[in-house]
């Protein structure tokens, strides 16, 4: 759980840092595989206006599955996709030059 929360916070920090030095509002389209308690830090940040304070407008959408989230990222309908690493592996194994990158993962030890 700690690793996952660190991953989510790293994403949020990365997005926040992208807006440093600008007064304009940047829109970030975020697609998640499903609404989940694992994304609680993100939901809190949205509700508390932390992203808006940093000049970010987050457009959150429920992708309805990892395949649909990956399709949204690959077609430019989403800037960031929250899904399992297997979706990225499938695209990578197709030999695509421009493939997504996994930068965080939640692992459970039971």
Give short role names for the model-derived ranges.
Residues 1-27:
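Short, low-complexity disordered leader/linker segments with a strong preference
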Residues 24-110:
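Short, glycine-/small- and polar/acidic-enriched structural segments
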């Amino acid at each position: 759980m700690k690793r996952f929360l660190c991953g989510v916070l790293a994403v949020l920090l990365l997005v926040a840092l992208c807006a440093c030095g600008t007064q304009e509002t940047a829109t970030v389209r975020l697609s998640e595989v499903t609404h989940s308690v694992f994304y609680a830090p993100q939901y809190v940040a949205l509700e508390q206006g932390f992203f808006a304070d940093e000049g970010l407008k987050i457009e959150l959408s429920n992708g309805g599955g990892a395949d649909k989230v990956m399709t949204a990222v690959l077609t430019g309908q989403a800037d960031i996709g929250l899904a399992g690493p297997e979706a990225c592996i499938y695209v990578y194994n197709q030999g695509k030059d421009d493939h997504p990158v996994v930068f965080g993962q939640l692992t459970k030890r039971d």
